[in-house]
């Protein structure tokens, strides 16, 4: 579960390395975000030749959480870190590559492009 002030790893080649959640989108009282949810992030650490810079604010989709996700068959998938993929204003990924696995829950949302770019879908 991701909330405000959560530090996140950027899992694409947009140039961001670390980001911080500044808002969970989807309602004024919404506190937590799970896999597949869109959040607003601020870039805290960036690569020198990347497309994004430190201090920039972007939308992002959560692709991995340490809290995990429960499937309808009873299984639970957890990851070692909390990771995001940065999005532009049209909710398309900024980067052209995705690092690390993503879950099938992104397929049901509008993020098929991220699923197709990912090296592994769990």
From Swiss-Prot:
GO terms for cellular component: cytosolic large ribosomal subunit. InterPro entries: Ribosomal_uL14, Ribosomal_uL14_bac-type, Ribosomal_uL14_CS, Ribosomal_uL14_sf. Binds to 23S rRNA. Forms part of two intersubunit bridges in the 70S ribosome. Belongs to the universal ribosomal protein uL14 family. It holds the Pfam family Ribosomal_L14. GO terms for molecular function: large ribosomal subunit rRNA binding; structural constituent of ribosome. The gene is rplN. GO terms for biological process: translation. It comes from the Bacteria. Keywords: Ribonucleoprotein, Ribosomal protein, RNA-binding, rRNA-binding. The keyword tRNA processing does not apply. This is Large ribosomal subunit protein uL14. Part of the 50S ribosomal subunit. Forms a cluster with proteins L3 and L19. In the 70S ribosome, L14 and L19 interact and together make contacts with the 16S rRNA in bridges B5 and B8. The keyword Acetylation does not apply.
């Amino acid at each position: 579960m991701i909330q405000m002030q959560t530090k996140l790893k950027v899992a694409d080649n947009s140039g961001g390395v670390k980001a911080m959640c500044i808002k969970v989108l989807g309602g004024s009282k919404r506190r937590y975000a799970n896999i597949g949810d869109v959040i607003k992030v601020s870039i805290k650490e960036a690569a020198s030749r990347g497309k994004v810079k430190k201090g920039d604010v972007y939308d992002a989709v959560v692709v991995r959480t340490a809290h995990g996700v429960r499937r309808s068959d009873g299984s639970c998938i957890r990851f070692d870190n909390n990771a995001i993929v940065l999005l532009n204003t049209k909710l398309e990924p900024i980067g052209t590559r995705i690092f690390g696995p993503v879950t099938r829950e992104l397929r049901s949302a509008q993020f098929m492009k991220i699923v197709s770019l990912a090296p592994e879908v769990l």
